[in-house]
Amino acid sequence: MASTYDTLTPEAQKGEVEIQNYTINFGPQHPAAHGVLRMVMELDGEIVERVDPHVGLLHRGTEKLIEYKTYLQALPYFDRLDYCSPLGMEHSYVLAIEKLLQLEVPLRAQYLRVLFAELTRICNHMLNIGSHVMDVGAMTPNLWLFEIREDCLNFFERASGARMHAAWFRPGGVHQDVPLKLLTDIGDWLDTRLPRLFEDAVSLFADNRIFKQRNVDVGVVSKEDALAWGFSGPMIRAAGIPWDIRKSQPYDVYDRMDFEIPVGTKGDCYDRVMVRIEEVRQSARIMKQCLSEMPEGPIASLDRKVVPPKRGEMKRSMEALIHHFKLYTEGFHVPAGDVYVATESPKGEFGVYLVSDGSNKPYRCKIRPTAFSHLQAMDFMMKGHMLADTTAILSAIDVVFGECDR
């Protein structure tokens, strides 16, 4: 009877084993996929040779649904795009409507928008930094950063009544004013709790040897490649390009704010995390300026063709009640035209191309998601890396599929 050794091939008897290429599915049911992403990967052993991302598993036809709603009814759809930073999505949409209407927004409303847009940025980065650190093997920082995120959600709830899907930014301003106690609480939080929790959490991993080994020189993108792939937000800033729409094309009161644009040097995963960490500090700086400079005054435009009458007025005036009913059923008519508005959302440039035919509903609303252009570079960034590095690269992109798939 032949021994096991005799049945082996000559190559195997010499101790040489040929590693064959094979194809695997990463996701869509995978905790590190950050949503319903399916990546078809071709591997040579553990080295990634090709990545083919399959998107669209969360496609809900948002752009088409918006065409059947009035301008105000379409607003909550934007909260459900990037559901980790909903107010960042609303911002582009309301600015686009205001540009078509040539609507003047009161100064207090602009300050409130900037305040909560930056709170949204902090909220988003807590989720991304925490989950990124957990994806590469650390648990504690994620739990600490989620305490800050919980504080942010509580502030959203106190301002709008909803923790996530706020629908608080409205054409002409914001839905309702915030109580003074909320503003003082946010100020106290920025001075004490936020820096303490945040810096403690960052100190656990920023200079950690294992964290650096998992992120430094992983998924490197040069300045030229970042521009060629259409990167924006922390992705392009990590590559060393100081591009920020809040500085280059300021909207609301960003032109009055004093803040720095953090940039990286290598364009790797470590730089992307560090850029987001510094962005949190800069956001806190902007919020403090908003709190100290915010004037008294109306929180929505005085144009009654767009903004509904006040609740007290409706109790006294039949005309105000009819006016309110008309605004919330028929909606307001927007002059014919088209406009593209982009804002600096926490993940990058979020754009809305809005086409009006003069009716009360958008003729077309094209949404420019931030992560779509980042995902197209997956093959470019992951090629030649180990399979374990793919989770770090994907997490550092910061992708949410509600926004990507629309």
From Swiss-Prot:
Subcellular location: Cell inner membrane
Pfam families named among the record's database cross-references: Complex1_49kDa (PF00346)
PROSITE patterns named in the record: COMPLEX1_49K
EC number(s) given by UniProt: 7.1.1.-
Keywords: Cell inner membrane, Cell membrane, Membrane, NAD, Quinone, Translocase, Transport, Ubiquinone
Family: Belongs to the complex I 49 kDa subunit family.
Protein name listed in UniProt: NADH-quinone oxidoreductase subunit D
Organism from which the protein derives: Rhizorhabdus wittichii (strain DSM 6014 / CCUG 31198 / JCM 15750 / NBRC 105917 / EY 4224 / RW1) (Sphingomonas wittichii)
Gene name as annotated: nuoD
